[in-house]
Amino acid sequence: MSCLSRLNASAAPWEPPVARAMAVEQYCPPPQSLLPPPPLPPVAVPTTCGCAACLQGCFVPVGVQAAFPHAAAGCAPPPPVMPVMIVYRVVQPPPPAAHATRCQITEIEDGGGVETAKAVDGDEPQPFIRTVRSTRRRKAAAIRLPKAFRAALLPPPPPPCALGFTATTTSLMIRNIPNKFLKARLMAILDQHCADENGKCHRRGGGGGRSVVKSEYDFFYVPIDFKTGFNKGYAFVNMTTATAARRLRAFLQDHRWDAAMSGKVCDVVPAAIQGLDAFVAHFSASCFPCRTKEFLPVWFEPPRDGEQQTKAHVVGRLVVRPR
């Protein structure tokens, strides 16, 4: 049978239905448009939440897993994440320690009295009150100089008035005398001093009728070592006035005995016994075991001034020991 249509000679030939079903369908894309392409359908993928359903191999669509990964599998959602809380605690300062009772301090007032200060519980310490011991320790720690330099930094010695000299001091102790000097030689030095000072006073006075204080002495004693026959390095003299005593001290103080070939430096200080009567009463009951009266104390009448003749009176008892 002919496959050509008798109705229309120009029409396409007719094909049986089986051949049409076996024809390959080709996809023709739609024309280009301005809208974005539609999304792809969800794909089933395994979840990785770690629950029991997930471990058995259940699958959750991708769209559902992105929002609620445990909803499709029937798992309980995890607990919500708790927010981080920062707690600040205010720490109170420790209470102040209880004030302890301080020790008792005794201070010496300027007038000689003693003032005692007792500490009371709760009173505040005074930072400006310092003891004498702590002040000395700080000064000693601050000064780290050699001994020679520390001696040079010491304050100067007090004036003569602070060493015991008063307006009534007449008796003197002459120290650091050469041991070979005997009484006669020392008396010659005193006589020469008195004569020179009296001559100066008369020249200054000029005969104007003013009273002149003379330099003269009425007691003298040089202790002697009876075994060696030398003096013990000191002597006692009593001047008739305090003015004469100050003149003698100014003459002999710090005197060097270079003429006697001695390195001693003379020192003059007030004697423990003051006055002629006190010297005579002190040495009258003394015994001197020697063979000559030249070693005994003497007092003079009238006082010696380096010019006029005087009479010497021996004080004490001479005791002669048998050989």
Swiss-Prot record:
Q: Name one GO molecular function term.
A: RNA binding
Q: Which gene encodes it?
A: ML6
Q: What is the lineage of its organism?
A: Eukaryota, Viridiplantae, Streptophyta, Embryophyta, Tracheophyta
Question: Which Pfam families does the record match to this protein?
Answer: RRM_2
Record protein name field: Protein MEI2-like 6
* InterPro entries per record: Mei2-like_Rrm_C, RBD_domain_sf
User: What's the superkingdom here?
Assistant: Eukaryota
Q: Which SUPFAM superfamilies match?
A: RNA-binding domain, RBD
* GO cellular component terms, A-Z: ribonucleoprotein complex
